[in-house]
Regions:
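Conserved N-terminal beta1-alpha1 strand-loop-helix module at the mouth
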Residues: 1-84, 137-138, 142-143
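Hydrophobic faces of well-ordered beta-strands that scaffold small-molecule active sites
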Residues: 3-10, 34-38, 56-62, 87-91, ...
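General structural feature for long, well-ordered alpha-helical segments within catalytic domains
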Residues: 20, 24, 42, 73-76, ...
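Glycine-rich, proline-tolerant flexible connector loops at the mouths of alpha/beta enzymes
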Residues: 25, 29-45, 63-65, 89-107, ...
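Generic secondary-structure signature for well-ordered alpha-helical cores
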Residues: 26-34, 48-51, 79-82, 86-87, ...
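Alpha-helix-loop-beta-strand connector modules within alpha/beta enzyme cores
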Residues: 40, 44-65, 103-128, 145-146, ...
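Catalytic cores of alpha/beta
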Residues: 47, 68-83, 131-142, 165, ...
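Glycine-rich phosphate-binding active-site loops on the catalytic face of alpha/beta enzymes
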Residues: 59-63, 83-97, 145-161, 185-188, ...
Length: 226
C-alpha cells in the first residue's frame, strides 16, 4: 500500500487561514491521502471541499492541552459529528488528571468523547514527551478502557513529537487491547514516516504529506502513487 493512505495531512496552527485549509484539502485530494486533520472551526469546510472523495475528515477536541471539561469535549465532538460530518475525532487526554493519579477520571473523560462520537472513531493523544515509559503503558490501558480506537503520540504543540521508541511501546500495548496507533509530531520526510510505520504506527499525522509522497515517488523511481 502506498504511504499516502497512512497519512493524515494536518494543519492545526492557530493562524491557519481559509486559503490554507483549501490548499491542504486540494493537496489531500491530489495525492489521495488518507485524511486531513483540522481544527473544529474548519471541519465543515474540509468536508465540503472533500465531498465525493475517500479522504477522511479528522478534527481535534480539547486541543492542545486536554484541560477542557469532559462536557465541553463531548459537546465539541457531537457538533463536529452531527453538523460537520467528520469521520474521526482526535482528543487530548486530561494530562492533569493522569499525572494526579485520577485514572477513573481519565477513562470517564475519554468515554464521554467516545459516546459523543459514535459510531465514529476516537483517537486519544497522550503527549508521550511528557510521560515516562511506565506512564505510556498505563495511558494505553486507559485509552482502551475508555473505548477509543487509537492511541496517538503527540499534539505537536508540546516539547517533543513522535519517536520510534515511543511508537514501539504504544504499538506493543495497543496490540494487547486491539487498538491502533497514530504517530504525530515532527514527521516530515518519507524515511521517518516509513520508520514509524515499521515500528507499528497505523496512521501518520503530518503537515508534510506532499513532501512525504514525493519522497516516496523518488525512492520508488516512478510517478506519484495513486
Amino acid at each position: 500500500m502506498s504511504i499516502a493512505k497512512y497519512l493524515e495531512h494536518t494543519l492545526l496552527k492557530p493562524e491557519a487561514t481559509v486559503a490554507d485549509i483549501m490548499k491542504l484539502c486540494a493537496e489531500a485530494k491530489e495525492y489521495n491521502l488518507g485524511g486531513v486533520c483540522v481544527n473544529t472551526c474548519y471541519a465543515g469546510l474540509a468536508r465540503h471541499l472533500l465531498v465525493g472523495t475517500d479522504v477522511k475528515i479528522v478534527t481535534v477536541v480539547g486541543f492542545p492541552l486536554g484541560a477542557d471539561r469532559s462536557e465541553v469535549k463531548a459537546l465539541a465532538t457531537k457538533l463536529a459529528v452531527d453538523e460537520d460530518h467528520v469521520d474521526e475525532v482526535d482528543m487530548v487526554m486530561n494530562m492533569s488528571a493522569f499525572k494526579s493519579g485520577n485514572y477513573d477520571g481519565v477513562v470517564e473523560d475519554i468515554a464521554a468523547v467516545v459516546e459523543a462520537a459514535k459510531p465514529y472513531a476516537v483517537k486519544v493523544i497522550i503527549e508521550t514527551c511528557l510521560l515516562t515509559d511506565e506512564e505510556k503503558v498505563k495511558a494505553c490501558e486507559l485509552v482502551a478502557k475508555g473505548g477509543a480506537a487509537f492511541v496517538k503520540t503527540s499534539t505537536g504543540f508540546s516539547k517533543g513529537g513522535a519517536t520510534i521508541h515511543d511508537v514501539e511501546i504504544l504499538a506493543r500495548e495497543a496490540n494487547r487491547y486491539g487498538i491502533g496507533v497514530k504517530a504525530a509530531g515532527g514527521i516530515r520526510d518519507y524515511e521517518t514516516a516509513k520508520a514509524m510505520i515499521a515500528a507499528g504506527a497505523d496512521r501518520i499525522g503530518t503537515s508534510a504529506g506532499v513532501a512525504i509522497c514525493e519522497d516516496e515517488a523518488k525512492a520508488m523511481g516512478g510517478g506519484l502513487p495513486k
